[in-house]
Amino acid sequence: VTYARNYTDVDDKIIARSHETGIPADKYAAMMIDKINAVMKRADVDDPTLWLKATENIGNIISFIQGLIDGGHAYPAANGDVYFDVDSFPAYGQLSGRSKEDSLDGVRVENDEEKKNAYDFALWKAAKPGEIAWDSPWGRGRPGWHIECSAMNRAAFGDQIDIHGGGRDLVFPHHENEIAQSEALTGKRFAKYWTHNGLIKVNGQKMSKSLGNSLLLDDLLDKYSSDALKFALLSGNYRNDINITDDLFPSAEAHLVRFYTLIDRAEKAFPNETGKEAEIDRRFDAAMEDDFNTALALSDLFGYFKEVARLLDANDPKARRITNHIRETYALLGLFKKDPAKYLAAYGEKEADVPAEVKAVAEERFAARKAKDWAKSDELREKLKSLGYAVKDSKDGYALEKI
């Protein structure tokens, strides 16, 4: 798979932040890109095959726009802007099922007098004083957001791409506009498949700066392993919204500690066993072919590791064959790539400070829950709180957190 990550490193928001901070737009964008790349590295996210920046594709963008003008799909305005003629593309709305007029909902339309129609969108924006700009056949200016993505994609992949990803909030108008631009120019289907991920909520509320509930990846990685974050995020369908609750990441970490413990035991018990179990591949492939059903793939892990525990107790080397295959296959999701001993040592250091009394109460409460003695369980939860600890339950265990 050739995977490209697009950086639209010149747009209205970057220019606005440049004016607010006094940092030149190109330097501000470079600083943000460096921050993104650094936190992705810390989260053990694989690098893309291609890193695409709009500012490194200005020539491609200008050529793309000129092609649209030549084909009758775009027009230059007297003020130096260039607009896409939405009426020239009858298939507009094919992805979202929405109309061109919908793009005007709640939007302040600028330069109406320069457009044929209010819903036409900018491909090139004439330079304003103090803005970053490039020379073009229509005067100095900069590209619009939508054309940046279309032109970069075409430069990297040609006229068609297999899979295009992005947030659900980008379906309209951004991805709709990408389709219109690209298919108007080439006459070919732009993308074969679209994978739109859901939005992030925190305790049921949309995550936003205004609500003060924003979570930064760097801050989460100070508390949890990258495996735990991936496990939590992959536990639901990517198309659905994900609700980050107080117990989401602690529960994921608790599962991973159990899994890594069994991997560590299997590797120490059978150091020379290199075989694998093909059934894991079959089930994993079936899950991925079901619209990247990572939730199903992760749910299989509980059964696999239950079997590993049973086999270890029976001193059966098949335990190692299963963990070998789990590590190889689930590495495709970024999981189980860490050294088990190092992972457990890091987590163990956090657990080492938990007093014996607290651990004993937690174990007693866990036993009460298994016996469905809910009154006793609630009583012991309150006792843990009085000792300074919160307990986060999961299907297979619990995790303790200092209050």
Predicted regions and their residues:
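Structural preference for alpha-helix termini/caps and helix-kink/transition segments
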Residues: 206, 213-403
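Short alpha-helical functional segments enriched in proximate histidine and acidic residues
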Residues: 39-42, 64-67, 71, 75, ...
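Alpha-helical recognition segments enriched in aromatics with Gly/Pro capping
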Residues: 1, 37, 59-267
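N-terminal, positively charged nucleic-acid-binding surface of large information/translation enzymes
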Residues: 1-46, 393-400
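Hydrophobic face of alpha-helices
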Residues: 26-29, 33, 150, 281, ...
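Short, glycine/charge-rich beta-strand/loop segments that flank catalytic centers
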Residues: 4-11, 33-36, 46-61, 79-86
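Surface-exposed helix-capping loop/turn segments at secondary-structure junctions
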Residues: 42-49, 74-75, 160, 265-274
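Aromatic- and histidine-enriched alpha-helix N-cap/loop-to-helix transition segments
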Residues: 56, 144-148, 292, 296-299
